């Protein structure tokens, strides 16, 4: 074997050895960190939700509620977290005094769990007229009252019903939209 060929073989073996060594290393903390978020109280690590899935029943309920009331309504999203997705099976009514629901504000009397709803993965409320459907003021990182409210809740997601779509947010404070019409 010629000297040039031996040199190429040594380089190839060294490269394979380094590749194998790197493959055995644990994942970068930065990469792992980006897939997890802190809970509302800042003590627990929870997976970042990247997808919100509404059942047909939940979509129908939201459409009916939105059309039925000139004031904000609030519901408890009942379901489960599956990996990086939250699956909402149904929307249960939140415990709200009628006098605590106006066209621009809704305040529950008690938490979803205290009202008897187990399996709550988030809270959803409406914005009649589909206005101001955001968790941050446009072009800023300044949280609206909805963003501030979500930050103090323990749930992985929060949502705003805005006519033909739902605006929602996850623990990473990333705001997303979901059409109300089921994707077929």
Residue positions per predicted region:
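N-terminal Sec-pathway targeting helices
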Residues: 2-15
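Hydrophobic alpha-helical targeting segments used for export or membrane insertion
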Residues: 14-18, 22
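Conserved beta-strand-loop surface patch within small alpha/beta domains used
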Residues: 21-120, 129-184
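Mature extracytoplasmic domains of secretory-pathway proteins
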Residues: 122-124
């Amino acid at each position: 074997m010629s000297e040039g060929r031996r040199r190429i073989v040594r380089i190839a073996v060294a490269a394979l050895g380094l590749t194998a060594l790197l493959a055995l290393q644990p994942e970068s903390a930065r990469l792992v960190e980006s897939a997890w978020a802190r809970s509302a109280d800042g003590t627990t690590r929870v997976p970042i939700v990247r997808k919100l899935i509404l059942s047909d029943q939940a979509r129908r309920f939201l459409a009916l509620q939105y059309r039925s009331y000139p004031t904000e309504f609030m519901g408890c999203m009942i379901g489960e977290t599956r990996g990086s997705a939250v699956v909402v099976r149904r929307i249960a009514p939140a415990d709200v005094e009628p006098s605590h629901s106006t066209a621009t504000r809704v305040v529950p009397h008690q938490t979803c769990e205290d009202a008897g709803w187990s399996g709550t993965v988030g809270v959803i409320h409406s914005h009649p007229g589909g206005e101001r459907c955001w968790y941050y003021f446009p072009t800023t990182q300044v949280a609206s009252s909805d963003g501030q409210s979500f930050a103090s809740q323990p749930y992985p997601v929060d949502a705003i019903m805005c006519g033909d779509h739902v605006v929602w947010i996850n623990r990473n404070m990333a705001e997303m939209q979901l059409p109300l019409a089921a994707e077929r």
